């Protein structure tokens, strides 16, 4: 059976692993998931990620989650915004800020997947994929 929203599944796997303080989490790979993982790494929400080849064509992404010195969570929240049944698009002048700039919004734009800060700097809008804080 096919999955109706693979990005929501990706975010849910990260959220669940983070809640029980797992060191790593594996999820099926895709280009957009790799781009989201790169953004999470660049913004300091995860330590690293690796794309693991498997016998099937798809492969896996292995994410190394990041925690504070006393095992406190770095990712306190993940929320899927644009869903298959209700897409959410924003124009360049209305790109959202998450928690007044403490979190990030991940957008899919005509120039690729990027954070809200990068989209504001380039003055482009797009589809709001998720909020991370």
Swiss-Prot record:
SUPFAM superfamilies referenced in this protein's UniProt entry, alphabetically: Ribosomal protein S8 (SSF56047)
Keyword Cell inner membrane included in the entry's annotation: no
Any GO CC annotation of this UniProt entry: ribosome
An MF annotation (GO) of this entry: structural constituent of ribosome
Keyword Transcription attributed: no
Keywords from the UniProt entry: Ribonucleoprotein, Ribosomal protein, RNA-binding, rRNA-binding
NCBIfam families for this protein: PRK00136.1
Family: Belongs to the universal ribosomal protein uS8 family.
Subunit structure: Part of the 30S ribosomal subunit. Contacts proteins S5 and S12.
Protein known as: Small ribosomal subunit protein uS8
Taxonomic source organism: Oenococcus oeni (strain ATCC BAA-331 / PSU-1)
Gene from which this protein is expressed: rpsH
């Amino acid at each position: 059976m096919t999955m109706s929203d693979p990005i929501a599944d990706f975010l849910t796997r990260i959220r669940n692993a983070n809640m029980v303080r797992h060191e790593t989490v594996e999820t099926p790979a895709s280009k957009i998931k790799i781009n989201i993982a790169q953004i999470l790494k660049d913004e300091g929400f995860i330590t690293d990620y690796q794309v693991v080849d498997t016998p099937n064509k798809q492969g896996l992404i292995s994410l190394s989650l990041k925690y504070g010195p006393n095992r406190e969570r770095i990712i306190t929240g993940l929320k899927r915004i644009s869903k298959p049944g209700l897409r959410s698009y924003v124009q360049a002048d209305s790109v959202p800020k998450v928690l007044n700039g403490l979190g990030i919004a991940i957008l899919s734009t005509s120039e690729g997947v990027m954070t809200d800060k990068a989209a504001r700097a380039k003055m482009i809008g797009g589809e709001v994929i998720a909020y991370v804080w």
